[in-house]
């Protein structure tokens, strides 16, 4: 971070800029404690450290970034923007797992959701693309990168999301399995003799597209599938099937859907994924304009047919802008 700050300082936009009013930090896990952007003081930083067991791969790096930025500009407010915060509006029945309540409460076992800054940005940007107030728009957001998640957003408020206590739940991802029968873990331990750490590594780092066909890059999966590779085709079909299931489920949750928005690396660039995911969903009001869908553009755009009841949008996400916007709004309110 110090090296980045030095590089930015060369053109006057670094941490030493007199125009700097805040430093925004992405913090992956806010638990139930942090449900909105928060100015960081010693107490807040200590609470973020306490959440490390819920995000052992991410929160330690987030803490380090905060510490470095505070040391460089102690006079400027540091703001934590939490990936989980946007999903904190889910009703309790959507956030709870159906396990023993005392055990769940004792170990903070519940659904938190992730990619929240992206889902927040894209849901608002989709409403703007439709020319309607965000409060009037119901949208299913599909954030499809190496990590992938879906959310159901009613009037700018998240009511359901696919990731759970960790980013492992939900859609098929580059290296993560997504939804899985929990008993698979018991089976692998009892019959396969795998340790907890080995199963953790298997499900998070060696599953998903990578586990099914040996590639986690959707471009390679598509190339191989197009050349007749059966394992790549199966991986692609499994990926798309899971997407369809979530689109259908979230259509039921929302009741009325105004748009389905695709975002992130795969969602923005892989027109084949969008086409396959929407194919066959005309009864839900979803029909693509195939030419518009295949055309590339860096701008937010509609790719649905003119007669479609539900818009299909491609909306490039901007998590950095969302973090900056939320941080600025907090310190200038």
Which residues does each PLM region occupy?
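Internal helix-turn-beta structural module
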Residues: 233, 237-258, 267-333
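A mobile "lid/hinge" subdomain adjacent to the ATP/sugar-phosphate binding pocket shared
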Residues: 191-235
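Short beta-strand-loop/turn "lid" adjacent to the catalytic site in phosphate-handling enzymes
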Residues: 8-58, 77-79, 85-96
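Catalytic phosphate/nucleotide-handling subdomain of diverse soluble enzymes
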Residues: 153-154, 159-195, 201, 264-295
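Phosphate/pyrophosphate-binding loops at sites that engage ATP/ADP/AMP, CoA/4′-phosphopantetheine
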Residues: 6-21, 126-133, 247-258
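Glycine-rich phosphate-binding loop of actin/hexokinase-like ATP-binding domains
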Residues: 86-191
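Glycine-rich beta-strand-to-loop/alpha-helix junction loops that act as flexible
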Residues: 25-30, 144-146, 257-269
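General beta-strand structural signal in soluble alpha/beta enzymes
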Residues: 25, 56-60, 77-82, 88, ...
């Amino acid at each position: 971070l110090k090296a980045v700050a030095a590089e930015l300082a060369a053109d006057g936009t670094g941490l030493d800029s007199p125009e700097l009013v805040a430093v925004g930090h992405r913090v992956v896990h806010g638990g139930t404690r942090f449900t909105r952007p928060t100015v960081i003081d010693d107490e807040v930083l200590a609470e973020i450290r306490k959440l490390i067991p819920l995000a052992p791969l991410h929160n330690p790096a987030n803490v380090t970034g905060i510490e470095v930025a505070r040391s460089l500009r102690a006079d400027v407010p540091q703001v934590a923007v939490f990936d989980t915060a946007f999903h904190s509006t889910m009703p309790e029945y959507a956030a709870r797992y159906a396990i023993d309540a005392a055990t769940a409460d004792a170990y903070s076992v519940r659904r938190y959701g992730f990619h929240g800054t992206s889902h927040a940005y894209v849901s608002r940007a989709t409403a703007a693309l439709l020319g309607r107030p965000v409060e009037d728009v119901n949208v299913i957001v599909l954030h499809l990168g190496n990590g992938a998640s879906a959310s159901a957003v009613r009037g700018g408020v998240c009511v359901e999301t696919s990731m759970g206590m960790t980013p492992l739940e939900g859609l098929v991802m580059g290296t993560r399995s997504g939804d899985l029968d929990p008993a698979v873990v018991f089976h692998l331990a009892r019959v396969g003799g795998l340790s907890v750490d080995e199963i953790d590594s298997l499900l998070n780092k060696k599953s998903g597209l990578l586990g099914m066909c040996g590639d986690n890059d959707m471009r390679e999966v598509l190339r191989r599938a197009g050349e007749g590779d059966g394992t790549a085709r199966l991986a692609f079909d499994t990926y798309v099937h899971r997407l369809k299931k979530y689109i259908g489920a979230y259509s039921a949750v929302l009741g009325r859907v105004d748009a389905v928005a695709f975002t992130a690396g795969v969602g923005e660039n892989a027109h084949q994924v969008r086409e396959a995911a929407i194919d066959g969903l005309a009864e839900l009001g979803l029909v693509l304009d195939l030419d518009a869908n295949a055309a590339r553009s860096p701008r937010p755009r509609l790719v649905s047919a003119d007669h479609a009841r539900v818009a299909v949008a491609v909306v490039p996400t901007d998590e950095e802008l969302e973090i900056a916007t939320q941080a600025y709004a907090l310190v200038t309110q």
